[in-house]
Amino acid sequence: MKFLDQAKVYVRSGDGGAGSVSFRREKFIEFGGPDGGDGGRGGDVWLEAVDGLNTLIDYRYQQHFKAKTGVHGMGRNMTGAKGADVTLKVPAGTQVFEEDNETLICDLTVVGQRFLLAKGGNGGFGNQHFKTSTNQAPRRANPGLPGEELNIWLRLKLIADAGLVGLPNAGKSTFLAAVTAAKPKIADYPFTTLHPGLGVARIDAREFVIADIPGLIEGAHEGVGIGDRFLGHVERTRVLLHLVSAQEENPGKAYKTVRAELDAYGNGLIEKVEILALSQVDTLDADARRKKVASLKRAAGRAPMLLSAVTGEGVEAVLRALMTVIAEARAEAAPVVETRWEK
């Protein structure tokens, strides 16, 4: 499935149905009064976070959504039915912005959350409402009120517990494939991963979600390479797993490059808990391994974990380190109650 993390959409709720002009007509009742019913309310436009989605690709092919108009009122005081609603289904982690792409309307972070984007117009009054002492047979009814319309931006920030960061070819996709059922594209050239990928890792009977982010290079925050566009997908993570390839000539410099890009991006990424690992250590002999570890330790101020997704060395230790941070963060997270939401 193709990946799309931003889309512009036009939505319009349904107009209200028109009220009816009608009079009671029955045998032996010569002067039946007005009995025109009210129009039905127009359909609403809802946004709902659903399970099983991790892209906004559907909104590349359809950008206009309109709820149905309410049914018109009828005689015998029959009110028209409400117009059918429209529900836009999006992945959890989707933010909705106004047309300026800056003003946040809502943020759907949990599967099952629903938000009312546009409320349907009210139905018009039938002529029964206009009967007075001086006008016993009003021939007047109201049209329904128009629905609301707006242009919105949908922006997806994937929800994962841990985010993989590092330079291209640091072994992020290989690690993701080794510890989850995900099947990312893996090859020996830069930017093999062009879009974020998700996988579920399991350790000690507990599970967490890992996001593989396309590699960063120096100047990514200025648009170099494929830029820092996808860094938004690690904003919601609880911990970063920073992989530095053992094949780097200068692991310390590689580490500092990625940290500088995280800092330049902002939004608190540089402050997130970071697990540091020297990956692809199976490609080194003992002497080379010591030198690379020393270089990385000098740059980071702490010793890295050693990891090889190919041989399995250090994989369980890294997963346990990630799970420890994630479990603590989950315990501290308090549920947030939003009064604007309807379910």
Swiss-Prot record:
Recorded GO MF terms: GTP binding; GTPase activity; magnesium ion binding
EC identifiers of the protein: 3.6.5.-
GO BP of this protein: ribosome biogenesis
Residues the record lists as binding GTP: 166-173, 191-195, 212-215, 279-282, 308-310
Enzyme class: hydrolase
Classification via InterPro entries: G_OBG, GTP-bd, GTP-bd_Obg/CgtA, GTP1-OBG_CS, GTP1_OBG_dom, GTP1_OBG_dom_sf, OBG_GTPase, P-loop_NTPase
Tagged with keyword Nucleotide-binding: yes
Keyword Repeat attributed: no
Gene3D superfamilies listed in its UniProt record: GTP1/OBG domain, P-loop containing nucleotide triphosphate hydrolases
Compartments (UniProt record): Cytoplasm
Cofactor: Mg(2+)
TM ranges: none
CDD domains referenced in this protein's UniProt entry, alphabetically: Obg (cd01898)
Keywords, in A-Z order: Cytoplasm, GTP-binding, Hydrolase, Magnesium, Metal-binding, Nucleotide-binding
Pfam family, one: MMR_HSR1
Alphabetical list of SUPFAM superfamilies matching this protein: Obg GTP-binding protein N-terminal domain (SSF82051), P-loop containing nucleoside triphosphate hydrolases (SSF52540)
Main location: cytoplasm
Function text: An essential GTPase which binds GTP, GDP and possibly (p)ppGpp with moderate affinity, with high nucleotide exchange rates and a fairly low GTP hydrolysis rate. Plays a role in control of the cell cycle, stress response, ribosome biogenesis and in those bacteria that undergo differentiation, in morphogenesis control.
Family: Belongs to the TRAFAC class OBG-HflX-like GTPase superfamily. OBG GTPase family.
HAMAP family registered for this protein in UniProt: GTPase_Obg (MF_01454)
Oligomeric and partner information: Monomer.
Protein name per Swiss-Prot or TrEMBL: GTPase Obg
Gene: obg
